[in-house]
Amino acid sequence: MKKIAFILALWAGLLGAFEPKKSNIYFGAMVGLAPIKITPKPVSDSSYTAFLWGAKGGYQFAFFKALALRGEFSYLMAIKPTALHTINTSLLSLNIDVLSDFYTYKKYSFGVYGGLGIGYFYQSNHLGMKNSSFMGYNGLFNVGLGSTIDRYHRIELGAKIPFSKTRNSFKNLYFLESVFIHAAYSYMF
């Protein structure tokens, strides 16, 4: 009985999943948090969480109603204000993601996404270290949950996770570890 109920639920969820869906250009904004850590610890406060904001845009090509591929260009900036200066971390990235909106109800669809990207990281850091900039290219994993509302509005909760640590530009002994956790809104044209 459980197998039959599962098969019926799966069939109902996939009903209409292979109908064509509109492809879109989209633009959006992101906010979130970025836990950042410098290793090995140069000073006692080398781990912190920074507020992040950003913008993104791209093209979403829909194969079917429940499956799409998107190319995206995004910029994220994480800011940590301190007493006398601000620590600024930036990520400029180009991403390719697969989206699967597997559950649809009336004007709403819900699903997951995952993909890969390449990004350029830069951080200007003044935590008691001289020559403390981190910069370099790194690969990214993109994962998250998303929902499309009324075909034009998309909200997402996701993360951009670098493949490896970013090396210090001047002192090769220090590395920057970070994850960019964000909530995003996009308008699809």
Which stretches of residues belong to each language-model region?
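N-terminal targeting signals for Sec/Tat export/insertion, comprising classic cleavable signal peptides
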Residues: 28-29, 33-44
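Gram-negative (and chloroplast) outer-membrane scaffold detector with strong preference
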Residues: 25, 33-35, 49-126, 184-187
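C-terminal beta-barrel architecture of Gram-negative outer-membrane proteins
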Residues: 125-133
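Predominantly the C-terminal beta-signal and adjacent terminal strand-loop region
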Residues: 40-43, 74-84, 88-91, 132-189
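Cleavable N-terminal export/targeting peptides
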Residues: 1-22
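Short N-terminal segments immediately surrounding and downstream of signal-peptide cleavage
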Residues: 19-31
